[in-house]
Amino acid sequence: TPINQPSDLKGLKIRVQQSPTNVEMMRLLGGTATPMGFGDVYTALQAGILDGAENNELALTDNGHGDICKYYSYDMHQMVPDLLVANYAFLNGLSDEERAIFEEGFQIVKSTEQDAWEDAVAEAKDKAENEQHVNFIYPDTAPFQEAMAPLHDSVLAANPELQPIYDRIQQHNAAHTAD
């Protein structure tokens, strides 16, 4: 089933990661959340236990989901950043020279990973379209983002210390809408 707007999810059983936040996310989008381990998704899709799943392009191709599911919607309901985490004691223990080397190395790693990911996604999309015959859909993302607002509000209400981080993310998103 092509998903062009949240209401298209009504009545569909969609695999989500096993977390209360992801279950609530799917409920707000109008679908029926089906928490399930990733290893069971292919069989569940094949058996009709699931109507769909949310995942990236590599899961679509590398795990064979595109052999069964013929639509992939870029609705941007969830964006998962990749993070590099470092201990403050480690960072603060570096000399100025070591810190400069570390930061230069980080930029190299970041660029290399980003390029490799973009290449892998392009290859996966090519395979999905040309071998698995998957149709990629680019719906208006605003309705999906609007549907997530209550989830954002509830998470922020329960964790007010996250508000400054959330605000910075929103500012970044507003400044980089074409990214």
Task: State what each model feature region is.
Residues 1-179:
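N-terminal secretory/targeting leader peptides
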